């Protein structure tokens, strides 16, 4: 029954982890016309599925056995919720009578993700087949702009193939209704110096660039980051622009997902704000929201561009000039990478410092137009970055590079523990001997615990972890070694890691001096 319901959807793919209780599900899904991968680690498996859904713009699902295995789906579920990604997690469960009665691999798992879901389905062995079929239909119908949990209790036997029993016809899918025309609130219709913030944007939503350019022509200031999928000449770099100050700003519109620039949010605090998104939460980023609208991001942006009055006085570009940096450090590494990646690539950015270097260099116009930029900026820390990038390339088949830190790569050490061959993902690991970002802020240093409790200063490398996961491995410690290693790394026919060793103190100095004195 479940397999028949799933067969009606166009899946980006599905990922399973080994386990007994999920055996009936795996046996049912094996004939689905969708790519399938098996990963040992459930945390990595869910992030693989997340990456596939993001890259393909179609739902993906992950399957696991009962007990704590299901809890390991949690980080990917939370990321999918805040990044508005159609991720389905299917958790096998034990019959309800066995929960809390001393049985192995049995926990209270029906509601473990409830606060971070857009829908769920709890199957029940005591109900009829048609009742359970309706539960599955309802869960699948809600699989849009966020994660859904399907919990499936299974009684033994688990491995026997039994004749299929047909349930009633599949429930109706939601009707496709023409979107309502967006109505501009007064704060925007009467604004003279409005600002549009374009947050993280999934390419499957549609091309935001034409509407953004039309708004800029009409006199709007547009600010964004590379995760907006906009070319850098279509918008100003969000944080650096706001650092220059916008004294006559009278309205802010935010659309899309999360954005990185923490200081920018503080700069905009108190500004009159209109937030647009497909569902809750529609965040009050500046403590001053005056209007909220529910709409598909692409449709809303088009309507805004069509309806916004022509203000007749475009903003002048507001970009700070970057200072030259010397020597081999993180800034030099990121500049070198930016100049080597062509427009047909997908770039995945690790959290912490990599995405911040990407933001800065995007604002300097260093990335080729057409590159798609991705990162787990919904809510995640360093978890699941390699897994998400692998799942993304697996689904998209586009050349893909992940730029991440050594702690992030080590943390996601289950990413490559797959049964089938890995996609030929390229990973640049910037090894600055710890969590570099904690050197950028004063609190950790003043605590006296910077190296131990915050930065986790170390002398490790990722070579053994990379090779254990099936990546070929190269390393470099200066620009000459980097240039020598790059051609074979980027052209490797399989998955490959290039680890770049940098000095953390020189990297800190270059970052803090990026605009000069």
Label each residue range with its predicted role:
Residues 1-63, 69-72, 78, 361:
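N-terminal cofactor/phosphate-binding cores enriched in small/glycine residues
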Residues 1-11, 52-57, 81, 139-144, ...:
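Glycine-rich phosphate/diphosphate-binding loops that line cofactor/substrate pockets in enzymes
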Residues 2-3, 7, 17-28, 316-397:
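Active-site diphosphate/adenylate-binding microenvironment
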Residues 2-5, 10-13, 55-64, 70-75, ...:
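Structural signature of the thiamine diphosphate
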Residues 50, 54, 65-66, 71-72, ...:
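Glycine-rich, anion-gripping cofactor-binding loops and their flanking helix/strand elements
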Residues 80, 90-136, 224-318, 419-420, ...:
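Glycine-rich, acidic loop regions that bind phosphate or pyrophosphate groups
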Residues 90, 97-110, 362-517:
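Thiamine diphosphate
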Residues 127, 267-355, 461-465, 470, ...:
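Phosphate/pyrophosphate-binding active-site segments
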